[in-house]
Each structure stands twice: as C-alpha cells, then as structure tokens.
C-alpha cells in the first residue's frame, strides 16, 4: 500500500502538467497503471474477474 503522503501529493494539481503522477485509484500503486482505467494491473485483474469493469472479459483462444 502506498504511503498516505504520496497518495495525497499525487492528488494535488501540479504546478506543471508534466509533473502529474499516474497512481492507481484504488490502492495508490505508482507502477503499471493503465491510463484508460486508472487502475494498476493487480486491481484491474481483480475488478475484471469480478465483472466490475464493463466491456472487459477474459480472453481465451
């Protein structure tokens, strides 16, 4: 779990737009965040398997 100060800092609007940090909306993880969903890979997988993300389903071939 990310520290509360880092999450709070990421939520603030930065002075320069290039300083915006992508963090997971659920857990605050800074790495491997999918921009389209705003979730890290772990939270994305959990929510997709639970059917909470519309239009996403597990692929098989």
UniProtKB/Swiss-Prot annotation:
Part of the 30S ribosomal subunit. Contacts proteins S3 and S10. One of its GO terms (molecular function) is rRNA binding. GO terms for biological process: translation. The keyword Ribosomal protein applies. PROSITE patterns: RIBOSOMAL_S14 (PS00527). Its cofactor is Zn(2+). Binds 16S rRNA, required for the assembly of 30S particles and may also be responsible for determining the conformation of the 16S rRNA at the A site. GO terms for cellular component: cytoplasm; small ribosomal subunit. Transmembrane segments: none annotated. Zn(2+) binds at residues 24, 27, 40, 43. Gene3D superfamilies: 30s Ribosomal Protein S14, Chain N. This is Small ribosomal subunit protein uS14. The keyword Metal-binding applies.
